[in-house]
């Protein structure tokens, strides 16, 4: 089962805005840029550099795993755009370790989504 089209992020203007955004999540194996959007659902894009992973098979495996984790953990997020950039070494992690990294990212995104106290 693939991620729904409404969760795909493809607009270059949004990519540029995400990269300029001050809201970031850094991990050893990935960087995530995020910001609120006007759509009522979360949207995500995964970027994997050819210089870090030469084989398309590896890049596709990473992309499938990341999308599976996002579908599982981002289900209760609202109105946020996320750009995930994968770094070297991500492929060597176990699936459970990858889930832990994305769980931390999801908690950070829920803080963004939560109403601010007055």
UniProtKB/Swiss-Prot annotation:
Its EC number is 3.1.26.5. The keyword Hydrolase applies. The keyword Flavoprotein does not apply. Transmembrane segments: none annotated. It is an enzyme of class 3 (hydrolase). GO terms for biological process: tRNA 5'-leader removal. Keywords: Endonuclease, Hydrolase, Nuclease, RNA-binding, tRNA processing. It catalyses: Endonucleolytic cleavage of RNA, removing 5'-extranucleotides from tRNA precursor. GO terms for cellular component: ribonuclease P complex. SUPFAM superfamilies: Ribosomal protein S5 domain 2-like. HAMAP family: RNase_P. Belongs to the RnpA family. RNaseP catalyzes the removal of the 5'-leader sequence from pre-tRNA to produce the mature 5'-terminus. It can also cleave other RNA substrates such as 4.5S RNA. The protein component plays an auxiliary but essential role in vivo by binding to the 5'-leader sequence and broadening the substrate specificity of the ribozyme. This is Ribonuclease P protein component. It comes from Mycoplasma pneumoniae (strain ATCC 29342 / M129 / Subtype 1).
């Amino acid at each position: 089962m693939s991620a729904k089209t409404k969760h795909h992020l493809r607009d270059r203007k949004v990519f540029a805005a995400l990269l300029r955004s001050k809201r970031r999540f850094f991990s050893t194996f990935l960087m995530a840029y995020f910001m609120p959007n006007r759509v009522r659902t979360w949207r995500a894009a995964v970027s994997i550099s050819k210089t870090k992973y030469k084989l398309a098979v590896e890049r596709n495996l990473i992309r499938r795993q990341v999308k599976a984790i996002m579908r599982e953990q981002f289900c209760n997020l609202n109105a946020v755009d996320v750009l995930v950039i994968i770094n070297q070494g991500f492929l060597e992690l176990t699936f459970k370790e990858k889930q832990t990294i994305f769980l931390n990212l999801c908690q950070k995104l829920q803080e963004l989504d939560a109403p601010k106290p007055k």
